[in-house]
Amino acid sequence: MATVVAFHAHPDDEVLLTGGTLARLAAEGHRTVVVVACSGGLGRGVLADPETRLAELRASAARLGVARVVHLGYADSGHGPVLFPDPPGQVRFVRADPGEAAGKLAALLREEGADLLLSYDAQGHYGHRDHVMVHRVGARAAALAGPVRVLEGTAPRETVALLFTPVRALGLVVRHDLVAMRAGFTPRAAITHRIDVRRFAAQKQAALAAHRTAVYGRGRAARLFRLVVRLPVPLFGLIAGREWFAEPGARTARPIGDVLQAAGPAPGPGQGTVRR
């Protein structure tokens, strides 16, 4: 059996990006660990009690069969033009020493004997500064710890842009969100793993519902979350029943359906292109 560590920026990210994959791994008998960099105090556009958000994370993780939850100790950096001062006794993640943060994560990877680290793509999905930092710290920690194999949690850029068009029409996002989505995530051709998690849709939806601060708060994201957690499970599974990853330095003829299966190296110069 394998040990898989999922490194995320904030509480609720573990559901949105890897919830079904974590539930599937746990059901198959593997050990799963969730590590969050930040406490969630600036999550989803609302000020929130960090301890409440971390408690919600633990409840979510339990619904996904996660064996252990760890907070690295950093505060949220927020998403937007303003970077707030550090709160008392904490450092905002984007201001953290990357080497120190990577050292903390590497120590945990060694302690767990991790076989795989789930991290983030280089764009930080839609450009969130904490998500970009997760990518940098995750890559460095994996190298320090072994190295440990890495998969970057992401989504096909083309699919994200397509889905956000009707969501924007419903008033749930604004223009700059759509622009960020079109420039973020990962091009479809670079996706190496596509995981079918439709059998775990009920668990994933229940885990999202555990994040009550995010679901019942204010703002566009909360309205969207409330809509999603109330969907019939088959419809939720249709929308959120696949999760995507990119393996750095690898390329596949078609996406692999198991995160524990490694992709082959990308073709070098003069070796042709991969047909998808």
Q: What residue ranges belong to the model's regions?
A:
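Active-site rim/loop-helix segments in enzyme catalytic domains that contact anionic ligands
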Residues: M1-G113, R140, A246-P255, T273-R276
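Metal-dependent de-N-acetylase/amidase catalytic core
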Residues: A2-T3, P85, V91, R95-R276
